[in-house]
Structure formats: C-alpha cells, structure tokens
C-alpha cells in the first residue's frame, strides 16, 4: 500500500528526524548501557507534543496515525527505547478508545495525549512469557466486578 505524505506529515517527519539526530542519537548508547528509564526522552517527546499525534482532536490530539508511524520510524532509526516510549504511551489509547466508556475516554485520553498521564501495559505470564497468544489469564464478569 502506498501513502502520499501530506505537507503536515513531511513537516513532522523533518522535525522528528532532526530531533532524533541532534538530541536522541547522542544519548542512545548511554540509554542502552544504563538500562534505566529515559525520563529526559519522555520529557522531550512530551515537550514536542509528539504524544498527541494519533489522538483524536477532541482529546487534544492531531488525529494523524501516519504521523505517529513516521515518528516511531524516525526515532527507531537511532534509539529503539525512545521510539518505544511513544508505543507504550499509545497502547492504552487504543484500548480505551475501542472499549472504554465515555467517562473513561474523557478522563484518560487527554492526559495520555499531553503526557500528563503515563501509558502502560502488561502482557507477561510465567508460562507464556510475552506471547500474547499463549496467555491463559481471563477476566470473567461476576457480581460486583471481574474475577481474574
């Protein structure tokens, strides 16, 4: 499938490419070596407004999945961990957007978009590791909530 980049997509690509080269690449080796959470990279992504890329405008976003993919690609060229900060921030967005109530969407999506809330997810079980197809844990609806 071929996508034509809009002028906005190209502008975002150029900004992200420059930031990746000038600010992220010099830190990439240290981030990998220390195996610590790169708070400075999270702050950089937040300050640049990049967390907003895939979010609908009504939640403070730019509504551009293609620009989000471009950002991951550009950061991924120089530092997997920085690119992954975007992915981790966006995973709950999709889950909440697809299955969340209006209240949950209104409560969580703006904060995920502006970076004031942190995205997170978990997929590991002792018998399956991170193979989501092998996960056996289930949430069953019962009176008063769910049983895991």
Outline where the language-model segments fall.
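Short secondary-structure junction/hinge motifs that connect adjacent elements
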Residues: 27-48
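Conserved acidic
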Residues: 8, 12, 37
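Intrinsic disorder at enzyme termini
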Residues: 1-8
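Glycine-rich, Trp-frequent "lid" loop and neighboring beta-strands that shape
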Residues: 60-62, 103-148
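N-terminal capping segment at the start of a domain
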Residues: 18-29
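Internal helix-loop-helix
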Residues: 47-116
